[in-house]
């Protein structure tokens, strides 16, 4: 996870300087295909125990098409706590639940257990040694091969390490992680040729330098997808736009422009305050919209059942009752899946307009970043109905007020 603060100054300067800042121009085209259901990813990491599903933490009541397993008790130290002593009990519960709910799984591999770590006493994210590379490359090969064999046909893809630009997660150099990526890729492709290989996912605006070095040294040739964590906490989702554009430019500069870009982890953390749960839900919705239109083809939200570190919670403390963010996750699937986003633009007043097209029928999503104000939809839209994100729709387009909470016009 990333707790750093990232400034939105550049984005606001662009919007303030020009009458309209647009996304979807020739150099930043949204994906041309309709938005698929599997664009919507999620983290679930408190739902299961080694003995099965925790009855106090039920599976989400909204569709979860894609699941990233991280902070879920299934990293290398959990799977092989001692050399040769394998424990797949908790991972198997996740895989069984995923199969039951027709959910694809992305498994993030890595973190060196103490017995395998090159620097077992070195401080890391939770206990010493985790961030170091393995002392013996053969231990890494055995771990990857064993996991890939165990999970063959049950895991859609493997992500090689988490947030390597943060010393708490990775203390080795880029060359060492390229080596681990190469070895893991070769093994996984041999064991499970259908599996998707995702690059190590750097995080934040300061992670672009790490990604550029990884790609410039040839790391991209070993992966199918470029992963990144576009955290902008505590700033609003619009702050992601220039960072995503920077990452896409880096990919183009280093021969990886043709690979998909996935945002494999995103959320907002405490102490970021939200004046209302409705605004928190709006952040989730705007993040999914803007990631897609800037070229991200999958986004994994962090996290469904975390009530401690995150500030945008999807459920109440009972882990059943949906909060506005949980509702927004499901509603947004209904709004977006099957639609093509033509583009988004922001005017000088920070009002964003995104044009959608579903099977030839145009629709528009509108919000203002920082205030509530009257809005008159253009006559050319021929809009007859407006649906606020968290409310019932109504057959009128008069007396409309837009706010930071998106509204759908159709």
Enumerate the language-model features and the residues they cover:
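Bacterial N-terminal signal peptides
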Residues: 8-17
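Conserved, mostly hydrophobic/aromatic
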Residues: 98, 147, 158, 163, ...
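C-terminal beta-strand-rich structural cap/linker in extracellular carbohydrate-active enzymes
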Residues: 393-410
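Boundary/entry segment of secreted carbohydrate-active catalytic domains
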Residues: 27-73
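Aromatic/acidic polysaccharide-binding cleft in carbohydrate-active enzymes
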Residues: 268-332, 343-349
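Noncatalytic carbohydrate-binding groove/subsite architecture in carbohydrate-active enzymes
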Residues: 51-53, 174-288, 294
């Amino acid at each position: 996870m990333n707790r750093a603060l990232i400034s939105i100054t550049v984005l606001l300067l662009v919007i303030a300087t020009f009458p309209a800042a647009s996304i979807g121009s020739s150099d930043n085209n949204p994906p041309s295909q309709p938005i698929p259901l599997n664009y919507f990813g999620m983290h679930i990491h408190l739902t299961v125990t080694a003995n099965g599903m925790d009855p106090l933490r039920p599976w989400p009541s909204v569709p979860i098409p894609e699941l990233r397993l991280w902070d879920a008790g299934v990293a290398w130290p959990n799977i092989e706590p001692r050399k040769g002593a394998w424990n797949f009990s908790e991972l198997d519960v996740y895989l069984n639940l995923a199969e039951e709910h027709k959910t694809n799984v992305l498994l993030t591999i890595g973190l060196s257990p103490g017995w395998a770590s090159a620097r077992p006493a070195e401080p890391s994210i939770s206990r010493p040694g985790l961030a170091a590379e393995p002392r013996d490359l053969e231990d890494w090969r055995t771990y990857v091969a064993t996991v890939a064999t165990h999970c063959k046909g049950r895991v859609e893809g493997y992500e090689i390490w988490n947030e390597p630009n943060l010393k708490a997660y990775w203390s080795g150099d880029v060359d060492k992680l390229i080596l681990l990526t190469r070895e893991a890729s070769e093994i996984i492709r041999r064991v499970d040729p259908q599996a998707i290989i995702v690059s190590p996912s750097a995080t934040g605006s300061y992670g672009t330098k790490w990604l550029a070095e990884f790609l410039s040294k040839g790391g991209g040739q070993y992966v199918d997808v470029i992963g990144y964590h576009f955290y902008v906490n505590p700033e609003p989702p619009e702050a992601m736009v220039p960072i995503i554009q920077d990452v896409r430019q880096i990919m183009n500069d280093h021969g990886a422009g043709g690979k998909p870009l996935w945002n494999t982890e995103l959320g907002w953390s405490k102490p970021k305050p939200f004046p209302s749960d409705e605004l928190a839900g709006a952040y989730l919705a705007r993040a999914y919209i803007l990631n897609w239109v800037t070229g991200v083809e999958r986004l994994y939200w962090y996290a469904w059942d975390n009530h401690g570190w995150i500030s945008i919670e999807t459920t109440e403390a009972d882990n059943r009752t949906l909060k506005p963010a949980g509702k927004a996750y499901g509603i947004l699937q209904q709004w977006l899946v099957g639609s093509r986003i033509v583009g988004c633009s922001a005017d000088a007043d920070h009002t964003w307009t995104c044009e959608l097209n579903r099977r030839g029928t145009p629709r528009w999503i509108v919000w203002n970043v920082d205030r509530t104000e009257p809005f008159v939809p253009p006559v050319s839209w021929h809009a007859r109905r407006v649906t606020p994100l968290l409310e019932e729709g109504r057959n009128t387009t008069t007396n409309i007020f837009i706010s930071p909470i998106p509204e759908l016009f159709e």
